[in-house]
């Protein structure tokens, strides 16, 4: 995607810079970008066009580029479908077939990106983790993966943007979950809340000696019918791809695991996401889920509430949401499992789940 203007246009395609912006601002950023299309085999990771894109991604500061199209780009939904682009992803402006694409001849590469790009023995997974630990923005890591710049030579390939986002979130969150295994559990039942773009979040962290995670999503359709999506993992990890919640699952899991890693703690986590379609009128991508959960868990925002029982914590988590606690409970597999386990233990050890 290229902006039709000169200067530093980083904010137009950099979710990390969008906190505090309105949905109108973000849609405006996206619609100002023109998307050029060229069709390539996924195994084609060389050639003038691909290498130009790779240079742009590795640049340590914004660089100039020029795109010439076969004909005037148009914002046509049917055209987007024909070109295989995902119309459910963040919006973007006009799209058209590229004729020529050129970049500035004075691009200086970010050394962190350059190292993993030229390391042809480094596995893609390890490259992703290395870049994350060195402070590279997630959106940049996702683009590096998408352009076939990570992994051993024989395994490098182009990756659709949506897949690269999910793969990056999954890889980093799995690494972080593994890293917190030996940490002490949180002391109390903790609840965090945050809302933006018509997305309302409640996160419950539960004292436990093992990691478990569940994400629930609830929404009302145009007819007023309630919809639910739920995916979860226990201490053994995911048994299959979380097809109900999909990429949002990994985005939320990354934010939670990241927070626990910084605190040097571990917990079982429940994430409730309620979507108000009258406010969330245009989907802006799973980045808003990751950033929404991050903001909820941000220590500086002082949003944490502590409780001594799972029931009171869960009740508080549901209290600011339109969907009733009964519905959230009915659709939650992990919460009901935890309740059954705690009731059984409480029968033999009264007061075990209350601080003295």
Where are these regions (language model features)?
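Long, low-complexity intrinsically disordered regions enriched in acidic and polar residues
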Residues: 1-356
């Amino acid at each position: 995607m290229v902006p039709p203007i000169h200067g530093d246009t980083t904010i137009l395609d950099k979710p990390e810079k969008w906190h505090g912006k309105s949905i109108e601002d973000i849609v405006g950023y996206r619609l100002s970008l023109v998307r050029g299309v060229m069709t390539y085999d996924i195994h084609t990771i060389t050639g003038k066009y691909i290498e130009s894109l790779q240079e742009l991604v590795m640049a340590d500061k914004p660089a100039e580029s020029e795109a010439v199209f076969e004909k005037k780009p148009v914002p046509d939904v049917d055209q987007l479908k024909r070109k295989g682009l995902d119309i459910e992803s963040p919006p973007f402006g006009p799209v058209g077939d590229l004729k020529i694409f050129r970049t500035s001849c004075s691009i200086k590469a970010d050394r962190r990106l350059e190292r993993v790009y030229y390391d042809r023995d480094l596995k893609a997974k390890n490259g992703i983790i290395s870049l994350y630990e060195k402070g590279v923005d997630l959106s940049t890591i996702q683009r590096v993966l998408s352009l076939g710049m990570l992994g051993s030579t024989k395994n490098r390939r182009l990756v659709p943007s949506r897949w690269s986002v999910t793969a990056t979130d999954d890889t980093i969150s799995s690494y972080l979950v593994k890293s917190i295994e030996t940490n002490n559990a949180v002391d109390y039942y903790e609840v965090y809340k945050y809302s933006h773009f018509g997305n309302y979040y409640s996160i419950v962290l539960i004292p436990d000696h093992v990691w478990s995670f569940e994400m629930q999503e609830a929404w009302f359709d145009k007819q007023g019918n309630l919809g639910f999506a739920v995916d979860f993992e226990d201490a053994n990890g995911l048994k299959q791809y979380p097809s109900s919640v999909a990429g949002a699952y990994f985005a939320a899991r990354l934010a939670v695991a990241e927070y626990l890693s910084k605190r040097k703690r571990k917990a079982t986590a429940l994430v409730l996401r309620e979507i108000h379609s009258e406010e969330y009128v245009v989907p802006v991508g799973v980045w808003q889920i990751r950033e929404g959960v991050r903001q909820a868990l941000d220590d500086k925002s002082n949003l944490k509430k502590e409780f001594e029982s799972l029931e009171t914590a869960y009740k508080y988590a549901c209290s600011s949401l339109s969907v009733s606690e009964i519905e959230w409970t009915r659709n939650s597999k992990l919460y009901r499992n935890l309740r059954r386990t705690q009731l059984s233990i409480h029968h033999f050890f009264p007061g075990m789940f209350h601080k003295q």
